[in-house]
Curated annotation (Swiss-Prot):
Source organism: Phyllomedusa bicolor
GO CC field: extracellular space
Name the record gives this protein: Skin peptide tyrosine-tyrosine
Gene Ontology MF: a single term: neuropeptide hormone activity
Gene3D superfamilies for the chain: 6.10.250.900
Signal peptide extent: none
A Pfam family: Hormone_3
Family under the similarity heading: Belongs to the NPY family.
Chief location category: secreted
Entry function: Shows a broad spectrum of antibacterial activity against Gram-positive and Gram-negative bacteria, yeast and fungi.
Amino acid sequence: YPPKPESPGEDASPEEMNKYLTALRHYINLVTRQRY
């Protein structure tokens, strides 16, 4: 499995949060595609 994206934390900027959510969505897609 690819490594899970690191959460930027509570004090993250909107840009960091956006980047994290995009990476997380990509990660979930990879994981679920491998599983099924």
